[in-house]
Amino acid sequence: LIAVLLIACDSEKKEQKDQINKENKSSAAFVLDNAKNSVEWTAYKTTEKVPVKGKFKKVEITSGGEGNSVKEAIHNAEFSIPISSIFTSDSSRDYKIRKFFFGVMENTKLLSGKLVIENDSLGYADITMNGITDKLPFTYLIDDKKFSMATKMDVLNWNAKSSLDSLNLICKELHKGLDGISKTWSEVAINITSTF
């Protein structure tokens, strides 16, 4: 009798769980959380402006991100990106960026933001980093079910000079150019794609 009750209760719990999962699935045609999202960046070192490429391996959609078109799904989508998901194909570089750049900032375990589409080619992201929220304009293109955006960010707009100085100090020799000057640029190119 106990075994029958346990099996019956277990089946009831499974049915309730299945019902909750069905309710959480969106009926929207385009769901950003289900898309293949890529957040890639290019920073620069040395006076010759040598590119250093990387990406964030994880992005979480925290609000919105659904619609009956790609544009609708992107517009007003809110996201967060864990700093721990940074990846440059060099684990020692990843550690230095996390500790000596982001680690110097205020409240920056996550980068967060909201995407706003203004017209058929322009938008902006309200990016929160280092305790500061600032507007970052971008250009974008929608090709079938793929959204691509590009922008350039100046980290000084997020009061990140001390973070930049900290990273440049720890990477002093690695960031020296042919002229013998060590430089870490404040400009970062960002490319984001979402394929639905």
Predicted regions and their residues:
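Sec-dependent bacterial lipoprotein signal peptides
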Residues: 1-7
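Low-complexity, acidic/polar, glycine-enriched regions of mature
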Residues: 9-196
